[in-house]
Amino acid sequence: MANILAVDDSASMRQMVSFTLTNAGHQVVSAVDGKDALDKAGAEQFDLVLTDVNMPLMDGITLTRELRALPPYRFTPILMLTTESGADRKLEGKAAGATGWIVKPFNPDQLIAVVSKVLGLPR
């Protein structure tokens, strides 16, 4: 299936996302913040990036902008998985290049459905 980069400063959230997507057949690599994610994205190609917004060192909006500046990630789906649900933040994410927005806490089936949809995979 897909190679997914999951970015969140919460270890429990990274574990839950990884568990959910691995059980759906995907390979998941975790990063603890935007800087860690950018380093991993430079070393390996991912089919999708799933990132929190509020993180230390580099937030998810900045990460999205930085990834979009890299040719291999210009068209890679980037989903924001966050507690932020305000319209202003969503617009900021979209302007940075985010493909979609999932609000925490998430339903595992919803996460799998959204990931499958943006990757063009059958569910």
Model-derived regions, located:
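Charged docking surfaces used in two-component/phosphorelay signaling
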Residues: Q15-N23
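Short, glycine/charged-rich "phosphate-handling" switch motifs in NTP-dependent
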Residues: T99
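His-Asp phosphorelay/catalytic-motif detector in bacterial-type signaling
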Residues: Q45-D47, P72-P77
